[in-house]
Amino acid sequence: MPRQATSRLVVGEGEGSQGASGPAATMLRSLLLHSLRLCAQTASCLVLFPRFLGTAFMLWLLDFLCIRKHFLGRRRRGQPEPEVELNSEGEEVPPDDPPICVSDDNRLCTLASLKAVWHGQKLDFFKQAHEGGPAPNSEVVLPDGFQSQHILDYAQGNRPLVLNFGSCTUPPFMARMSAFQRLVTKYQRDVDFLIIYIEEAHPSDGWVTTDSPYIIPQHRSLEDRVSAARVLQQGAPGCALVLDTMANSSSSAYGAYFERLYVIQSGTIMYQGGRGPDGYQVSELRTWLERYDEQLHGARPRRV
């Protein structure tokens, strides 16, 4: 009898040790996963840091007005003269990509601007979207009713879907909205367009610029984002508009901060524009749409 009791005791101790090892193993795996993520983020920061320093140095130089005027003036002179386009009434149409203007009273190298630049470069580095790859089906929100949807819900069959990311406080985005609207009017028969309102580029409580056409603080809630999007919607009629989530899921997936253009077709990214402000070029989108239109209608048989 004593021997049996002893054997039971030993078995009980073994079961207890196995039960204790379960939580310990789970904790160890969790710790290892967090360590790997930390190492990956550290490595990415080391890769991004030289690029960030270069941008910061450029912003510091541009705070000297003589350098700013010379640099911006040289960029304007280096750009080819756009072809003059006339509307139906014979009036000259503004260019697709008007030059970026920075007022003399705006400081470019500040703590707020450096935070915004770092945020944008980090989103671009970690984005899931790449030209030729699958389009992330990230979550978006309808302005009316806050109903949750996804970006690919707006894709219809084989029709291209143009994504235009931006906000009201981004001067290049707003300055080129009229050019974007002309493309919507011209190609909406064969192409779908979607504006995704993201976090403010130059909020009144962040990186402030007097060149921004609106004074809007950072969004603290979806209600704030809806209010800002309503302002944009008044100037962009006829085009579907949705909101990015407060977790900025779409902006993160597409690396869209400050602004960006994409074209999706059959779940694949066919065109990926550069990151704004410099890479945001409506003229590039126009070129892509013109080529698509030629291929689409050129393949159709002609009536004799």
UniProtKB/Swiss-Prot annotation:
Location of the protein in the cell: Cell membrane; Endosome membrane
Catalytic activity: 3,3',5'-triiodo-L-thyronine + iodide + A + H(+) = L-thyroxine + AH2; 3,3'-diiodo-L-thyronine + iodide + A + H(+) = 3,3',5-triiodo-L-thyronine + AH2; 3-iodo-L-thyronine + iodide + A + H(+) = 3,5-diiodo-L-thyronine + AH2; L-thyronine + iodide + A + H(+) = 3-iodo-L-thyronine + AH2
Stretches that traverse the bilayer: 45-67
EC number: 1.21.99.3
Family: Belongs to the iodothyronine deiodinase family.
Function: Plays a crucial role in the metabolism of thyroid hormones (TH) and has specific roles in TH activation and inactivation by deiodination. Catalyzes the deiodination of L-thyroxine (T4) to 3,3',5'-triiodothyronine (rT3), 3,5,3'-triiodothyronine (T3) to 3,3'-diiodothyronine (3,3'-T2), 3,5-diiodothyronine (3,5-T2) to 3-monoiodothyronine (3-T1), rT3 to 3',5'-diiodothyronine (3',5'-T2) and 3,3'-T2 to 3'-monoiodothyronine (3'-T1) via inner-ring deiodination (IRD). Catalyzes the deiodination of 3-T1 to L-thyronine (T0) via outer-ring deiodination (ORD).
Ranges of the Cytoplasmic topological domain: 1-44
GO biological process: brown fat cell proliferation; hormone biosynthetic process; positive regulation of multicellular organism growth; response to hypoxia; retinal cone cell apoptotic process; retinal cone cell development; thyroid hormone catabolic process; thyroid hormone metabolic process
Recorded name of the encoding gene: DIO3
Pfam family, one: T4_deiodinase
Subunit record text: Monomer. Homodimer. May undergo minor heretodimerization with DIO1 and DIO2.
Region feature Disordered, mapped onto this chain: 1-23, 78-99
UniProt GO molecular function: thyroxine 5'-deiodinase activity; thyroxine 5-deiodinase activity
Organism per entry: Homo sapiens (Human)
Tissue expr: Expressed in placenta and several fetal tissues.
Cellular-component GO terms for this entry: endosome membrane; intracellular membrane-bounded organelle; plasma membrane
Top EC category: oxidoreductase
Residue stretches of biased makeup (Acidic residues): 82-95
Keywords: Cell membrane, Endosome, Membrane, Oxidoreductase, Selenocysteine, Signal-anchor, Thyroid hormones biosynthesis, Transmembrane, Transmembrane helix
Record's bilayer topology term: Single-pass type II membrane protein
Active-site residues, Swiss-Prot/TrEMBL: 170
Protein name: Thyroxine 5-deiodinase
Positions in the Extracellular compartment: 68-304
